[in-house]
C-alpha cells in the first residue's frame, strides 16, 4: 500500500448516526503520543463533507482546545447553513466527554464551476532560486535517532537548502536566515485531494498552532497534481 492509500485508509470514519462518526486515530500520524494536528484537520474535514450537501471545503478554520490521546474519538457535525451554492457547518472532536478540537468550514462544488478561474497565482520567487535537486530530505534523526515524528515518514518532504536548520553549524549566525520553511511535499500514489491539503497545512516547522492559538507562522501552499506534489 502506497503513502496516498495509507492516508486515505487513516481517514476512514465509521458512521454512527446521520451526523455522528467514530474513529480510532492512526498512530502513523502521531507526534509522540498525540495525533498530528494536520491529520486531525483532515479527519474532521472528511466528516464535514460527509454530512454537508456540497463536496468540497473552500474555507476552513480549526481550534485545538485540549490534548487528544491514542483512544477512540467521536466526531459530531452540526450544519449551520445549507444553500444552493454553498453550505457550512462545524465538527466537534470529542474524547472522554471533552471537546478537544473544532473544525469550521464552508463547502461548495468546485467540479460544477465553469468560466474564468481567478484563483490561480504564480509560484513564489523562492521556488526558482534553487534547483529541486538541491532540496534536502527532512530528517531530524540526524540530531537524535528517532526524533523525526511518525507523520513525517508518511510522505516525502524536501526542504529548501536555506531552511535546513538542523544541518547548520552550532556557531552559525541565525539572523542571516528568514524564519520560514519552504518545501516540496509529496504523498506518492495519488493526486493531492482536499484532505491532503488539510494534512499539509500543519506539516512544516515551526508548528502552526496549538491549544493556545496561532504561533505566527504564515503558510502558502500550491499543488501540482501532475507530479503529486504539494509545495509549501
Q: Where in the sequence are the language-model features?
A:
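Single conserved hydrophobic/aromatic residue that forms the stacking wall/gate
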Residues: 221-232
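Terminal targeting signals and extreme-terminal segments of soluble enzymes
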Residues: 1-223
